[in-house]
C-alpha cells in the first residue's frame, strides 16, 4: 500500500507532491527544507489538527506576504481513498471520499504515534511534558481518555477559581470536589496501567537497541491517592486556595539499574531509553490497530552513533507505515531527499 501526498501553499512548500511507500521511509535534507512540514501534513490528514500551530500559521510566506489558502491531499492508492484538508480565509474543511466536514469526525481519524524532538527531553523535562507524552499515546488507544482529560482540566480550573474567592458556597465546592475526585482517579489509574505495561517491556527493548544487559524500568509517582474516595477525603480535609493534589500532579521516573536515569545514564543511554519507549508504544499500538496505525518520527536520531541508529531503524516495529525525518542518511531503507 502506498500513498500520494500533495501540499499546496503549506509552510515552505508551494506545490510539492511525493509518493510514500508502505515500508519505513526516511526524509532527509537540510534544516529549513520542509521535512517536518511533510510529517505535519500527514498528521493533519489523519488527526484533523496540527501539534505545531493553528491553521492560520501554516500559510506559506513569500517575503512579507502570506498566502490566502493552503491545501493537503493524501491519497491511498491501494484503497482509492482521498483525504483533503483545505484552509482559506479562516475557514477549514475536511473531505474524506467526497464527504465534507467542518471538523474531522472521530470515526474518520486514523491512529498516529507522533514523536517530536522535544520528546527527547522526557527524562530531564518537566512532569507536565511527561504527562502530555503518555496522555498523547493513551488517547490514541482509548479516545475517551482525551475527553476525560479535557473535562478534568475544566473542573480543576473551576475549582481553583472558586477556592480563590473570599466567600463561596460549600455545596458548590462539593459538586466540583466530587467531579474532580472521580476524574482524577480514573485518569491516574489509566496512566498507571499503561506505564506498568510499558515498564515490563522496557528492559528487553533497551537491551535490543543498545546491545547491553542493562535493567531499565518506569516508576509511577501519583499526585494523589488512587481511589476517588481517598481523594475526596483529602480535599474535604484541606481548604487551600489552590488544588494541590490530583492527576495534574502525576509523574513518572525512568530507573536505570537502581538509580534515576537522568542522574547516572549517559546522554546516549538516555536517548536509547527514549527510543526503547517509543518502540514499545509502537508495538502496543500495532497490537490494537495492526498496520492501520501510522508512526511519525521527527528528527529523533541526530545524536545517535551509527550502530545505534542502524539498530533503531531495523526494529521490527518501524518496518511499515513509519515516516521519519533526519538531516542525513546512508543506508538501505527507502529515503526521500529534500533541498
Per-region residue spans from a language model:
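A short helix-turn-beta junction within AAA+ P-loop NTPase domains corresponding to the substrate/partner-engaging
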Residues: 332-339
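Conserved lysine of the Walker
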Residues: 35
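Conserved NTPase motor "head" modules and their coupling/switch loops across ABC/AAA+ ATPases, GTPases
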Residues: 1-30, 174-294, 303, 307, ...
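Nucleotide-state sensing region of NTPase/ATPase domains
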Residues: 44-129, 138-141, 145, 199, ...
Amino acid at each position: 500500500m502506498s500513498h500520494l501526498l500533495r501540499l499546496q501553499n503549506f509552510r515552505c512548500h508551494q506545490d510539492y507532491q511525493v509518493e510514500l511507500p508502505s515500508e519505513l521511509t526516511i526524509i532527509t535534507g537540510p534544516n529549513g527544507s520542509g521535512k517536518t512540514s511533510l510529517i505535519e501534513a500527514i498528521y493533519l490528514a489523519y488527526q484533523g489538527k496540527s501539534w505545531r500551530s493553528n491553521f492560520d500559521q501554516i500559510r506559506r510566506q513569500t517575503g512579507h506576504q502570506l498566502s490566502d489558502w493552503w491545501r493537503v491531499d493524501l491519497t491511498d492508492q491501494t484503497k482509492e481513498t482521498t483525504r483533503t484538508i483545505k484552509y482559506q480565509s479562516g475557514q477549514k474543511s475536511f473531505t474524506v471520499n467526497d464527504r465534507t466536514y467542518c471538523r474531522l469526525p472521530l470515526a474518520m481519524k486514523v491512529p498516529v504515534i507522533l514523536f517530536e524532538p522535544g520528546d527527547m527531553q522526557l527524562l530531564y523535562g518537566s512532569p507536565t511534558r511527561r504527562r502530555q507524552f503518555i496522555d498523547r499515546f493513551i488517547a490514541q488507544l482509548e479516545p475517551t481518555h482525551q475527553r476525560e482529560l479535557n473535562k478534568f482540566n475544566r473542573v480543576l480550573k473551576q475549582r481553583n477559581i472558586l477556592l480563590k474567592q473570599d466567600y463561596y458556597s460549600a455545596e458548590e465546592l462539593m459538586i466540583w470536589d466530587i467531579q474532580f475526585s472521580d476524574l482524577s482517579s480514573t485518569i491516574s489509574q489509566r496512566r498507571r496501567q499503561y506505564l506498568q505495561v510499558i515498564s515490563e517491556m522496557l528492559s528487553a527493548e533497551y537491551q535490543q537497541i543498545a546491545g547491553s544487559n542493562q535493567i531499565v524500568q518506569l516508576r509511577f509517582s501519583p499526585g494523589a491517592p488512587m481511589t476517588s474516595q481517598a481523594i475526596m477525603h483529602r480535599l474535604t480535609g484541606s481548604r487551600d486556595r489552590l488544588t494541590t493534589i490530583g492527576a495534574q500532579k502525576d509523574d513518572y521516573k525512568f530507573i536505570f539499574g537502581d538509580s534515576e536515569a537522568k542522574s547516572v545514564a549517559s546522554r546516549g543511554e538516555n536517548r536509547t531509553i527514549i527510543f526503547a519507549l517509543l518502540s514499545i508504544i509502537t508495538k502496543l499500538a500495532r497490537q490494537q490497530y495492526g498496520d492501520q496505525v501510522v508512526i511519525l518520527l521527527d528528527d529523533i536520531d541526530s545524536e545517535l552513533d551509527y550502530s545505534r541508529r542502524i539498530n533503531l531503524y531495523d526494529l521490527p516495529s518501524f518496518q511499515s507505515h513509519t515516516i521519519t525525518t533526519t538531516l542525513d542518511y546512508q543506508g538501505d531503507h527507502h529515503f526521500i531527499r529534500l533541498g
